[in-house]
Amino acid sequence: RQMCIRDSCHSVQGTAKMLAEYLDVKPESMSYWCVGINHMAWYLQLKSDGVDMYPKLKKIAESKKTIAEASAKEGHYHRHVGDKFNDGVRFEIMKYFGYFNSESPFHMSEYVPYFRKTPEMIDEWHVSIRWWLEHELSNDEYYEELKKQVESEEDIPMPQGEEYAPNVIHAVLTGKLFRANLNVMNTGLITSFPHDCCVEVPCFADSEGIHPCYIGELPEGPAGLNLTNINVHRLMAKAAVTKKYQYIYEAIQLDPLTAAMC
């Protein structure tokens, strides 16, 4: 039996909230059209109350000082890394490729060969902190907290988060339309990419299911950067299916981070 899989991530909506903080606008005023691949999607349109925010965002990118000032307004990563957070990587990518990217500067720096060539560069671009490792190592503490909540007679706090899944499920069950950026197979949705890759595109969910949006061609620069990672994805998928190590060797050689380190 063939399975229909739709994968969700929080980077698109999470970054949109960060951009609202950088731009000094309300998060609920933001609208965007973000497409690409998971952890490397591009905000092709970025608006607040219908006004294009890219001129203001590109103004921030003009100097390290303005980038640092904007980064200081961000709330999520500051809870993990404090004042060391700086979004210079993504502003630099936008400077050359024209669009802001959906993934954090820490992780985005691992998808390209530009920022991790030397320890000095890693420090310069503020991507030395491995906060996600610390987050993973705290799972035992989190598990104990969950046990206490389950064993307690008090109500468990369940504030609405930013993850797409609950709203997508609600849309399918009730028919109330909801739009989410989801990861789906590229059935001709992005014509710049191979048909056998996974893409991240806006999708509409309702009682009839999940409906990915047709995108067409991406701008050549952002598409080219996506393809450097799509090549790795496809080879690793082949390695998993065929159990052939050759595909793993080829994927490692093509990985942009290999170019940064070798």
Each model region followed by its residue ranges:
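Short, small-residue-biased leader/transition segments that mark boundaries at the very start
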Residues: R1-I5
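Acidic, His- and aromatic-enriched active-site or binding-groove loops in soluble protein domains
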Residues: R6-Q13
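Long, compositionally biased stretches enriched for glycine and/or charged residues
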Residues: A20-C262
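Alpha-helical scaffold elements adjacent to nucleotide-binding pockets in ATP/GTP-utilizing enzyme cores
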Residues: T15-L19
